[in-house]
Amino acid sequence: MAQAFNLVADSVAPERGMYAYMPNAPQEHNNIFYSAVQTDTIQAGDFMKLSATSTNTACPVVEKCAIADVPYGMVVYDCRVNAHKVGERVALAKSGEIVWLVANGEINVGSKLQMINGTVYVDDTTTSASAYVGVAVTKANAQGDLIQVKLDFNLGVAG
């Protein structure tokens, strides 16, 4: 008898910033996005840090990481929006969670990864003074491949 709907198939097309496993895991979803530039936006897969200037006592306020900032979390894929605006609440994936990210080139399993500033990519080429964001769980063969990454913000900054 043929199955009408396969609940265990892995045929859902992954997107940058989407959870690879346990998409219904508890997540920190009440972070407020801040930027001094009111027209700035963030997208799934962007890495965020806690805002050092926040005086909010109700929930975390986050801003986009610079290349040397150690992340607090990564913006999770949301099928309802392409980008989040300043002042909106965003969900963040945290250390230990496995997400889909875009490779800058060939990456081997187990490689420590850094974000490439100003792009959507992660790479295993260590750049001095750049923060690590996690470890490759699957292999990438070329630039643009989606790979599974176990987020680990405790790896610190290179060099």
Please describe what each predicted stretch is.
Residues 1-159:
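Surface-exposed, low-hydrophobicity beta-strand/loop segments enriched in small/polar/acidic residues
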